């Protein structure tokens, strides 16, 4: 694995040890972080459009391979590690995600697969769909499998899940601030493994909209809102090195993080 350390993801000449920030190594060879963000936005938006409109068909296995395939397709123009698990542990604000070294990423993604395949999505009403979707997303968000692009990958995956139901997902109906806050609050409590999806249920109530044609096993082109909502701006995720201790957050209360390292979008 080439990317074993935090610093290895960055061009050395752009990396600032004091902040843990720099420009991620990329297939463009671009050293300017802002320019990279613009280029990434353009290419991944076009790829996302292909996925949500069914122009590219990925096997709907709802497992780790499915999630990696989405990420690999979205970021194939940008990073050589597209579709590959991150090699470092990361956190965002007060949220610390799955410990990749302890095998937690696969464990959480196995739970995602279990939840999706064990649910009769076509029979769910709006409230049931909102609760089931919130639980699936909470586990997927806690996995946070990739160094970059977890949010975009997760939204496409959730749209693939919604294809099984009588609903579509319109992410533009909630602000990025509401989405990010609900996602943060869904993380496990101290010393616990299980995410707490309660904060996400009202969000999915809002973004879940009736599907005109009912459940589908095909991508039906859920509209442009998902592409727009997935990329309203370049999002940043503050990350830090793992301490080697528990990978759950201290609590679900907002607080000031310490030891912030780097930026993940």
Where are these regions (language model features)?
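FIC/Doc superfamily catalytic core
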Residues: 1-265
């Amino acid at each position: 694995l080439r990317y074993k350390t935090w610093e290895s993801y960055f061009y050395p000449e752009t990396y600032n040890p004091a902040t843990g920030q720099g420009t991620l190594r990329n297939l463009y060879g671009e050293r300017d972080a802002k320019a990279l963000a613009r280029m990434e936005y353009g290419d991944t938006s076009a790829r996302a459009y292909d996925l949500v409109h069914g122009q590219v068909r990925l096997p709907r296995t709802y497992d780790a391979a499915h999630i990696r395939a989405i990420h690999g397709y979205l970021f194939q123009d940008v990073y050589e590690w597209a579709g590959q698990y991150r090699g470092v542990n990361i956190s965002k604000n007060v949220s610390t995600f799955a410990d990749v070294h302890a095998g937690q990423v696969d464990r959480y993604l196995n739970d995602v697969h279990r939840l999706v395949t064990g649910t009769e999505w076509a029979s769910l009403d709006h409230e049931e769909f909102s609760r089931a979707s919130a639980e699936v997303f909470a586990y997927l968000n806690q996995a946070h499998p990739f160094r970059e692009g977890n949010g975009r990958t997760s939204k496409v995956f959730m749209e693939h899940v919604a294809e099984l139901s009588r609903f579509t997902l319109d992410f533009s109906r909630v602000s990025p601030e509401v989405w990010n806050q609900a996602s943060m609050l869904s993380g496990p409590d101290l010393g616990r493994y299980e995410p707490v999806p309660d904060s996400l249920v009202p969000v999915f109530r809002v973004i879940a909209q009736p599907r005109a044609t009912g459940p589908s096993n095909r991508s039906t082109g859920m509209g442009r809102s998902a592409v727009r909502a997935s990329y309203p701006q370049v999002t940043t995720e503050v990350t830090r090195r793992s301490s080697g201790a528990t990978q759950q957050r201290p609590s679900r209360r907002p607080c000031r993080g310490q030891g912030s390292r780097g930026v993940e979008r």
